């Protein structure tokens, strides 16, 4: 079954920890592992007072006496200045180390996105801090092509290798690249289905991430019971990818990157929009239409009218009109 639950004060409009605490309260505490984060992204929460309040609120909302895995959330976003303001200058990292020593935090780590210099800096302090784990984005596209997806990212191959050098276990986020690896276009999907016709396309991405021996666990954001059941089939037990399958997935990644999609992982860090746009939904609809061939190059394309109609009908179904891109003011926020 599933026994590792990942949450954050920032998820589900601030309600995720409370909901997680209610859901897990019925189970014996020793039967599950709970991961949450110090998500003090906003400058208004950088102070020691506000950061401490967020930390203690996590315990209250989760209804627990200790946290199994506590993460410095999203280090790398904002560079060294943000890292210093959020965790170093305010003494929060020192505080969390003392909390680990006291047993209220069982394992201390960080999740990484963005500036690679911050990742390298924190690993350079491993001898002093003794990171228990690190959460990285790893999937068969980001393994060698992270910068082709997002120029701010770093190849997972490098991130994972740096953790292995230091014997730091890796927790994997975005194994499906924000769901994109479960929504391949028909041609790419057919190539994987030909090899394993009874298995889902998503299972290939999970098997890829789970094959690496220093992976502690692979996170999965599941919406439906079918997702959970598919994941349980994939991991119980996990069948590691063969070298031939690694080659197939690398070829799939290269072919996928030829499609001009927007590098959106549906993380929702761009939300809320001050003008009410549903930014992730807009980008995901566009990407889906690209993969399905419903975005013509120009008005001279033979199938322009048909593709335009399919795009707009799907757009209205996917995104409420008051939240569509035509309401964007270009505010840059």
List each language-model region with its residue ranges.
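Short, acidic/polar
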Residues: 1, 46-62, 114-124, 201-206
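N-terminal binding-site loop/beta-alpha segment at the start of enzyme catalytic domains
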Residues: 1-32, 65, 95-101
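Residues at the N-termini of beta-strands
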Residues: 4, 66-69, 107, 133, ...
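Acidic (Asp/Glu)-rich catalytic clusters
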Residues: 21-31, 59-65, 122-129, 165
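Structural motif corresponding to the early beta-alpha repeats
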Residues: 27-52, 73-76
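Active-site groove signature of glycoside hydrolases
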Residues: 59-83
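Beta/alpha (TIM)-barrel catalytic core signal, keyed to glycine-rich beta->alpha loops juxtaposed to Asp/Glu
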Residues: 75-277, 281-284, 291-307
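Short Fe-S-cluster ligation motifs
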Residues: 292-331
């Amino acid at each position: 079954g599933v026994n590792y639950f990942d949450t954050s004060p920032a998820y589900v409009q601030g309600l995720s920890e409370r909901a997680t605490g209610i859901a897990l309260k019925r189970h014996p505490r020793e039967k599950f592992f709970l991961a949450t984060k110090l998500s003090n992204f906003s400058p208004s929460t950088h102070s020691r007072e506000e950061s401490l309040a967020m930390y203690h609120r996590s315990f209250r909302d989760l209804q627990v006496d200790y946290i199994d895995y506590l993460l410095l959330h999203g280090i790398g976003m904002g560079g060294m200045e943000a890292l210093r303001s959020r965790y170093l200058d305010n003494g929060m990292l020192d505080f969390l180390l003392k909390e680990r020593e006291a047993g209220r935090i069982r394992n201390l780590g960080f999740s990484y996105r963005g500036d690679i210099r911050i990742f390298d800096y924190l690993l350079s302090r491993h001898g002093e801090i003794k990171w228990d784990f690190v959460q990285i984005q790893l999937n068969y596209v980001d393994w060698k092509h992270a910068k082709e997806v997002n120029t701010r990212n770093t190849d997972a191959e490098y991130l994972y290798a740096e953790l292995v050098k230091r014997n730091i276990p890796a927790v994997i986020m975005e194994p499906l690249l924000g769901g994109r690896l479960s929504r391949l276009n028909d041609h790419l999907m057919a190539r994987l289905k030909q090899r394993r016709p009874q298995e889902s396309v998503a299972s290939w991405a999970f098997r890829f991430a789970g094959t690496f021996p220093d992976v502690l666990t692979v996170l999965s954001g599941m919406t439906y019971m079918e997702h959970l059941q598919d994941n349980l089939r994939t991991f119980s037990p996990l069948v590691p990818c063969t070298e031939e399958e690694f080659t197939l997935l690398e070829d799939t990644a290269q072919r996928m990157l030829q499609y001009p999609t927007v590098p959106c992982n549906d993380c929702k860090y761009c939300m809320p929009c001050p003008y009410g746009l549903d930014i992730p939904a807009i980008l995901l609809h566009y990407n889906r239409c690209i993969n399905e061939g419903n975005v013509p190059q120009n008005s001279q394309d033979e199938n322009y009218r048909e593709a335009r109609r399919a795009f707009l009908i799907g757009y209205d179904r996917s995104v409420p009109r008051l939240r569509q891109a035509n309401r964007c003011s270009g505010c840059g926020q």
